[in-house]
Amino acid sequence: MRFLTAGESHGPELLAIIEGLPAGLPLSEEDINPWLEKRQKGYGRGRRMVIERDRVEFRAGVRGGRTTGAPVALAIKNADFKNWAEIMDPAPGNWPRKRALTAARPGHADLAGGMKYGHKDLRDVLERASARETAMRVAVGAVALKLLSLLGVEGVGYVPGMAGVWAKVPFSWDLVPRIEESPLRMTDPEAEAEAIRRIDQAKAEGDTLGGIIEARFRGLVPGLGSHVHWDRKLDGRLAQMALSIPAVKGVEIGPAFENAMKRGSEVHDAIYWSPERGFYRETNRAGGLEGGMTTGEELVVRAALKPIATLMKPLPTVDVVTHEPKDAARERSDTTAVPAASVILCALSAIVLAQAYLEKFGGDTMEEIQERVERYRERVRAY
């Protein structure tokens, strides 16, 4: 399974083409739209989320509520485009255009992208570099999550800590309903209240906040990924996908950075066997991956999200046309997007996992894949 996305932050729409989905996957807009809604929620979001009401539209590859085996094409309209139609007009015109951006914003792709492509209007960089692009990748991830759900896999994204506040209530699958109702997707109401207070303070001071996001999956078969070649190692693929999320600057599988400061005897998960459970582990400090492959335990992917780079009290910069000092431009932005980023991390991790299932089990139809996965589960149980 592979996919491409296209579209700008203030263009008419976002697009995706997904190739390699099996025929017969039950799929409707309502399998995708709830995930788009989750991405738009979260305390600390900006005015853009008031304007947009993201809804996916199928353009190809789905008929009668099922995939046909052909490429699936998705579209999400940008409601804000009506306010930017002249600025984003693809027709030839004289430069500079309205709302041209020449003062590179620190922490953004503006300057490096301008240098790379020779743009003097840095809007040609920021429009594609914007996190708005993740709306379509979440839609693709929702398709992957639908496929995984039919293979017995469940996923969730949440926030273990943000704004300098850590949740003291550990994650449990029983807390998923609480997470889904939480404005910060946190497990701990007290920590959440303090984080909200800090978000309000940062907003009043024209500042931004980051945090830690985590995606968890259960029900995975062991053996997804590979130890044979470096580029098939699942932890490497998950890390690459996580680091492709705008503002993510670090990733770990399980408590990796904590593990790094301990002895091996304190870190590695002992293996047990019983007739009822087969092979199992009492701990999961490996985060569900060993040797680049799933172990069958819960998969835990954690990422660090830096504070959003667009500040209401902008940092000093330089105009790329005049080379004169300037303050960075103020583009509409969030105070924090950590809760939304946890949804994005879950959706994007699901894409990698769906790809791993399709690579391992193959099959042109959903029924074929389900049969092959079940036979594999039986073989693993008998091992």
UniProtKB/Swiss-Prot annotation:
Binding residues for NADP(+): 39, 45
Name this polypeptide is given: Chorismate synthase
Spell out the PROSITE patterns in the cross-references: CHORISMATE_SYNTHASE_1 (PS00787), CHORISMATE_SYNTHASE_2 (PS00788)
**Cofactor remark:** Reduced FMN (FMNH(2)).
Positions that bind FMN: 128-130, 291, 306-310, 332
Q: Which GO terms describe its molecular function?
A: chorismate synthase activity; FMN binding
Q: Which organism is it from?
A: Thermus thermophilus (strain ATCC BAA-163 / DSM 7039 / HB27)
Subunit structure, per the record?
Homotetramer.
Cofactor(s) needed for function: FMNH2
